[in-house]
Amino acid sequence: QYMDPKAARRMEPFCQYAVAATGEAIRNAGIDLEKEDLTRFGTCIGNGLGGVATIEKEHAKVMNGKANRVSVMMVPMMISNMAAGNVAIAYGLKGKCTDVVTACATGTNSIGEAYRYIQVGDADVMVAGGAESPICETNVSGFISMTALSSATEADRASIPFDKDRCGFVIGEGAGVVVLESLEHAQARGAKILAEVVGYGSTCDAFHITSPAEDGEGAARAMTLAINEAGITPADVDYINAHGTSTHHNDLYETRAIKKAFGEDAYNVNINSTKSMIGHLFGAVSYTHLTLPTIRL
């Protein structure tokens, strides 16, 4: 539906997901690409883990004495930027083409940076989001070693963010893409505007390679930056779609971050995490922080 079989064979699943999700987003937005200036139409689609499954497959050939049989497509299939690259190729998008790789924040950072590109006049329209296909032996083994995966034996207790009995996450796969455009561009084409991006904050804990800062200071500062840019107050926020990985440390430290950023208003805002329903999509998961609340508006 979104790509021919030959093109699909040259893509890791995360790239296939990105191309399909972008097609759905463009269709949902009612955009006619033939009427667009494609040099002003960009791509910012991130990926966190790359094509580890491809690396596994081709490395096995090397270890079995068949290095000369390694696929010529191994490198372009495994590198993270090919989610954005394949989307640009599939739809002829000739504006900015960037790949954000910031682990679980990838999707949100991609949308935020695309917002900035439009804000400063570098693009009129951007497709932005994240894509991931992490389910393979190496990735699963690594997360098991980190004790990050759920040990629950009952499915409805396997991914339970902020629950006192939480014990890790469940790996998911997929992609999510949104169309961002300047207000002027949207109005000129008579677009049905679903939501407006009015604030974006991005910070770093500079603390540890896997653990968030225990006091939540960095995450709190990111939320405060977004709130301030939007020109609102914490009391104006109705809902937070949290990272909520269902791990002990993340959910505890994220709760501290929300309380630090929102003060007493933290007790009045609705909070949940979509990982209880779709699992952890890593580089793709944080697009849900924008898209699912938008759908509910």
Question: What is the role of each PLM region?
Answer:
Residues 18-29, 83, 110, 182-183, ...:
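Short, well-ordered amphipathic alpha-helical segments that serve as non-catalytic structural scaffolds
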